[in-house]
Swiss-Prot record:
PROSITE patterns: ACONITASE_1 (PS00450), ACONITASE_2 (PS01244). It comes from Shewanella woodyi (strain ATCC 51908 / MS32). Its EC number is 4.2.1.33. Belongs to the aconitase/IPM isomerase family. LeuC type 1 subfamily. [4Fe-4S] cluster binds at C347, C407, C410. Binds 1 [4Fe-4S] cluster per subunit. CDD domains: IPMI. Keywords: 4Fe-4S, Amino-acid biosynthesis, Branched-chain amino acid biosynthesis, Iron, Iron-sulfur, Leucine biosynthesis, Lyase, Metal-binding. The keyword Iron-sulfur applies. It holds the Pfam family Aconitase. This is 3-isopropylmalate dehydratase large subunit.
Length: 466
């Protein structure tokens, strides 16, 4: 029977599938951070259970750590409690921890892949919705709740219902200046933020295959923003090249065996998807959100939509509510929208390729008057590489702040946050009301678009700035 990539990975991980109940699947990798793990560890202690597979569990600190200082004194009282609790729990249960003083510390979805923890054909879970990022390697990766975190800790398994399958094919090649962030925002704009609900999405097509692993991670990262359970991309030579030699990747003879196994991780030619969506890559322009969800997105040469043009009453009301919150008027050109804050970072866009793209638009220029811009590398390794390439100097000389790794301004959970009324060009993944701070207004863009906006003080078409 012909199978999709998702079905192949799923079927190989089913432990028990009894009629009338959700199947039990095996988990290969469990990623842990300081925010969603404390209660899970407490549950293990109360029940007197040990960790089932400490060697398959990896922890880091990222959500509420400071990007200004690696000192515990820089944390809020609650953040410090969470960080110190994770330290204690990892020590007690024998878990590998990349704490704020470790050179490899970083955002969990940046750190995992770059260390080779993420591998094709594996099932990966984490108490974080953007675990879908790891699907870029042909892994089945998804976020779980705290009670599920405890279940995986205790059993290395999880009960899950099988999802439907969706293929999103991006045909042809993008034009110069178009990035993975533009591709995924265009997809969300097409199908909506609930278009993938109930599905595991496989991204394919020439435009997807042409992406680097960094770009593929950006696309899969935002599968959640289209409502999907997970996003996946079939592994290929690009995947193998990225993984070879990384700390936790297979070595020597095991590497050759892995390459052979990974070659089978692709959708069979005659496999049938439950749903198919097709986009033409050449039609994709630089994208940016105008409203309060990732589906409220337009091209840079577009305008803020008019709710009066929307026939659906529910959608019309949503547009009106969003316009009121973001303080924009229908018909406004997106190029006329001014910003006063810029955030380049997050698990969506904080990898070395992202920083290189942003630096191209910052080099020899300067942040506009009245604009505050921060650049937050996704991990210690990304920071080290960027500094070796001189990217930090480019940003600093251009007036950007160069920070330590962490989730930072993606969410208002640490000391990087917006004030009420701030308007931010952000490379993160969510532009919900208050996401970056109470009363803040967020516009999702690519790193290049964010850097260009920082310099201009408003959104610009990056295709015309280089």
């Amino acid at each position: 029977m012909a199978k999709t990539l998702y079905e192949k990975v799923w079927d190989s991980h089913v432990v028990v599938a009894n009629e009338g109940e959700a199947p039990l699947i095996y988990v290969d990798r469990h990623l842990v951070h300081e925010v969603t793990s404390p209660q899970a560890f407490s549950g293990l202690k109360v029940a007197g259970r040990r960790l089932r597979a400490p060697e398959k569990t990896f922890a880091t600190m990222d959500h509420n750590t400071s990007t200004k200082s690696a000192s515990l004194d820089a944390l809020s009282p609650m953040a410090r409690i969470q960080v110190e609790t994770l330290q204690d729990n990892c020590k007690e249960f024998g878990i590998k921890l990349y704490d704020i003083h470790h050179k490899n510390q970083g955002i969990v979805h940046v750190m995992g892949p770059e260390l080779g923890i993420t591998l094709p054909g594996t099932v990966i879970v984490c108490g974080d919705s953007h675990t879908a990022t790891h699907g870029a390697f042909g892994a089945l990766a998804f976020g779980i709740g705290t009670s599920e975190v405890e279940h995986v800790m205790a059993t290395q398994t999880l009960r899950q219902n099988k999802a439907k399958t969706m293929k999103i094919e991006v045909k042809g090649h993008v034009t110069p200046g178009i990035t993975a962030k533009d591709i995924v925002l265009a997809i969300i704009g097409k199908i909506g933020m609930d278009g993938g609900t109930g599905y595991v999405v496989e991204f394919c097509g020439e435009a997807i295959e042409a992406l680097s692993m960094e770009g593929r991670m950006t696309v899969c990262n935002m599968a959640i923003e289209m409502g999907a359970k997970a996003g996946m991309i079939a592994p290929d030579a690009t995947t193998a090249e990225y993984l070879k030699g990384r700390e936790f990747a297979p070595k020597a003879e095991s590497w050759e065996q892995a390459i052979e196994a990974w070659s089978e991780l692709k959708t069979d030619a005659d496999a049938v998807f439950d749903s198919t969506v097709i986009l033409e890559a050449a039609d994709i322009a630089p994208q940016l959100t105008w409203g309060t969800n990732p589906g409220q997105v337009v091209a840079i040469d577009g305008v803020v939509p008019n709710p009066q043009d929307e026939p659906n009453a529910t959608v019309k009301a949503s547009i009106e509510k969003a316009l009121e919150y973001v303080a924009l008027s229908a018909g406004t050109s997106m190029k006329d929208v001014s910003i006063n804050k810029v955030f380049i970072g997050s698990c969506t866009n904080s990898r070395i390729e992202d920083l290189r793209d942003a630096a191209l638009h910052a080099k020899g220029k300067h942040v506009a008057e009245g604009v505050t811009a921060i650049v937050v590398p996704g991990s210690g390794l990304v920071k080290e590489q960027a500094e070796a390439e001189g990217l930090d100097k480019i940003f600093i000389e251009a007036g950007f702040e160069w920070r330590l790794p962490g989730c930072s301004m993606c969410l208002a959970m640490n000391d990087d946050r917006l004030e009420a009324g701030d308007r931010c060009a952000s490379t993160s993944n969510r532009n919900f009301e208050g996401r970056q701070g109470r009363g803040s207004r967020t516009h999702l863009v690519s790193p290049a678009m964010a850097a260009a906006a920082a310099v201009a003080g408003h959104f610009v078409d990056i295709r015309q700035t280089l």
